[in-house]
Amino acid sequence: MSDLQDKISIVTGANSGMGMATVEALSDKGATVIMLCRSEERGRKALAELTGEKARKLDLMICDLGDFASIRSFVRSVKAKYPRIDILVNNAGFISLDRQETKDGIERQFGINHLGHFLLTTLLLDRMSAGSRIVNVASGAHKVGKIHFNDINLHHGYNVVRAYSQSKLANVLFTRELAERLKGSGITVNCCHPGAVATNMGVDRETGFGKTITGLLRPFFLTPAEGAATAIYLATDEAVSHISGGYFYKCQIAKSSKRSKSRRTAGRLFELSEEMVRE
């Protein structure tokens, strides 16, 4: 799959950081890339930057992963325009010091990082077939995570680590369970830890919190392109064409937490997620 001519792909969180690096890499290989962005302004800026360098087949489409109605509308638009989806890279991420909620009343980190991508992916499955690939950008933070089934929206004892690690563990569990459910279809789904990447994800746009810390630590971070390398590998490389349900780091299978390997927890989370996104 190294030549992606005629391949149609979607990248979420496509306007900056690893998402933008992923769009660049896939389009460089010839793919048509649908750029899913929440902000039209930031999306247009990224699109102009990417198409200013060279001719690329890019399609900017606006969608808020924290709004189920917006996701359903996006999927309807995609299906009206494209006959199939060959690659889906669920890259968008959100992190916040204070507890916030999505438009649907879900704790925002779980709502965007997991549920938004869960709904997007499951709605697009009927446009995928043998050879299609799904890549979920997870994080090593899943290793300290736990799924709080009795308080999934973290109304009690919220803190940023608890919320973020829960959402990232959900990414790994979703990958495992979906891989089981897709067995025999030829569609693969894998996830990865990108490493420590200097992106704007941790920066609160209102207060600027995180900018100083990010600035000080920037020399120790990976670039967005380096961080995106494993997701791009999973989306395109022949070496992983028959691997599904894996957790990768630096383009290799990596060790994930004990909790992330529980079939019972994965199945329970999948069923809860279906229930939470139901219209």
Language model region names:
Residues 198-215:
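A glycine/serine/threonine-rich, flexible loop-to-helix segment
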Residues 107, 150, 210, 214, ...:
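Generic detector of well-ordered alpha-helical segments enriched in charged/polar residues
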Residues 1-203, 276-279:
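Rossmann-fold NAD(P)H-dependent dehydrogenase/reductase core
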Residues 53, 208-209, 248-250:
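A short glycine/small-residue-enriched secondary-structure motif
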Residues 167, 191, 214-255, 261-271:
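C-terminal helical subdomain
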Residues 154-158, 213, 253:
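Short glycine/proline-rich turn/loop motifs
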Residues 183, 206, 236-239:
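Hydrophobic alpha-helix feature that most strongly marks membrane-spanning transmembrane helices
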Residues 42, 205-208, 265:
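Short acidic-hydrophobic sequence patches enriched in Asp/Glu that either
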